[in-house]
Swiss-Prot record:
Stated name of the protein: Adenylate kinase
Residues holding AMP: T33, R38, G59, Y60, V61, G88, Y89, P90, R91, Q95, R160, R171
Pathway the protein takes part in: Purine metabolism; AMP biosynthesis via salvage pathway; AMP from ADP: step 1/1
Domain notes for this protein: Consists of three domains, a large central CORE domain and two small peripheral domains, NMPbind and LID, which undergo movements during catalysis. The LID domain closes over the site of phosphoryl transfer upon ATP binding. Assembling and dissambling the active center during each catalytic cycle provides an effective means to prevent ATP hydrolysis. Some bacteria have evolved a zinc-coordinating structure that stabilizes the LID domain.
Location in or out of the cell: Cytoplasm
């Protein structure tokens, strides 16, 4: 039987980290719309160029683009009978309605991650990426042994534009406007699981395992 999960919450709350941990432990597919967008941007395709402009300005990718990308990805997984975790999708009522037109709402479990905004700001603004191999570091939690260089290939680490403070604040504002009513909506459907994401990753995973049948 296919298990379908949605990890939901503000930027920087740890959705990707939790989804990766669960995917590795239980063998689920981790579907990150952010990673899909970044691979499109790296390919320098027509869609990638369009996405790059939106992402670097801290803007929001239109539902029409995101929905079609997700639809194609999920169709392949459903065909192969693979369980999956959606990370970064859905984020609007339009996206939710689109997703639940593909599968019934009750076939999903929504993990709602929450943490104070100051913790989110610290987590995001401290991220550093290797532009060559995409290795990730953090100036507070996972410093490179080579200071500002990548341990793997010695490239100078960079901060993504959407991890700069001004972009983070803009993203959080967009999130608040778009998702205030979504938590209530998921709760009314009886598919919401609330998780305290201010703790460390092992404690967050433990809480999830206590609340959700994986």
């Amino acid at each position: 039987m296919i298990k379908r999960f949605i990890v939901f919450g503000p930027p920087g709350v740890g959705k990707g980290t939790l989804a990766s941990l669960v995917s590795q432990k239980y063998g689920f597919e981790h579907i990150s719309t952010g990673n899909i967008f970044r691979s499109q941007i790296a390919s320098n395709s027509e869609l990638g160029i369009k996405l790059k402009e939106i992402v670097e300005s801290g803007g929001y990718v239109p539902d029409s683009i995101t929905n079609e990308i997700v639809k194609k990805t999920l169709a392949d997984l459903e065909k192969e009978q693979k369980s999956y975790i959606l990370d970064g999708y859905p984020r609007t009522l339009n996206q939710i309605e689109f997703l639940f037109s593909l599968n019934k709402a009750q076939e999903y479990s929504v993990w709602f991650l929450e943490a104070p905004s100051e913790i989110i700001l610290k987590r995001l603004s401290g991220r550093r990426i290797c532009p060559s191999c995409n290795a990730q570091y953090h100036i507070y939690f996972k410093k490179s042994k080579l200071d500002t260089k990548c341990e793997i290939d010695q490239s100078e680490l960079i901060q993504r534009k959407d991890d700069q403070e001004s972009s983070i604040i803009k993203r959080l504002e967009i999130y608040e406007k778009q998702t205030n009513s979504l938590k209530k909506y998921f709760k009314e459907l009886g598919i919401l699981v609330e998780i305290d994401a201010s703790k460390d990753r092992e404690e967050i995973l433990k809480e999830l395992e206590q609340k959700v049948s994986l």
